[in-house]
Amino acid sequence: YQIRGLGAKRKVPDFDDLVFLGASMSRYPLEGYRETCNTSVILGDRFAKKPIKLDIPITIAGMSFGALGANAKEALGRGASAMGTSTTTGDGGMTQEERGSSKYLVYQLLPSRYGMNPDDLRKADAIEVVVGQGAKPGGGGMLLGQKINKRVAGMRTLPEGIDQRSACRHPDWTGPDDLEIKIQELREITNWEKPIYIKVGAARPYYDTTLAVKAGADVVVLDGMQGGTAATQDVFIEHVGIPTL
């Protein structure tokens, strides 16, 4: 089978297909020059001692160091901070550049466990347990050797220049009951301060969301199929999962 990155090339519904309901009588319009529209959102106040308050309900999803360079990760942190929102580490751990430039940084915990460091969990503002990605729900991935330079290899405890297969599921839990235990473990490591996200690839969103909430997640992240990935089977990218819309 063919391995490639990015998202689906086929035409799927996207955000350009959205239409919005305007205000009239049943919903009174605001005068923009003297009234404000509050777009802030609080994430994590269900259980976390330190929930995150974002100025806008739009965040930057995970893109790993290795797929992106240190300058790009720093730029994402600066941009997110300027807009009052969060950015996400992606697979492979946390860089000093990204942490230093990000007001709110979400740390991803993936099945591969690449770069996983309890100290970095405590430095993050939230933790995102990645069960799956929209571009490959239920499937693993491939970290190409050409991306594994000396720094990436050191962060992920891998040999330089060798292709690495990423697991399709976490090695230490197999279902929602185990997930509840894992969430409790992460809360204890971080002194119950950090919001815990659960990220799933959009495939069975009703059931997956129900199980994630039941397991104790503060936030559920649904990743649509066109979200993209670093590398996986082409058939997954094109034909598995459902679009965000």
Predicted regions: what is each one?
Residues Q108-Y114, A153-T157, I242:
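Glycine-/small-residue-rich beta-strand-loop submotif within the FAD-binding core of flavoenzymes
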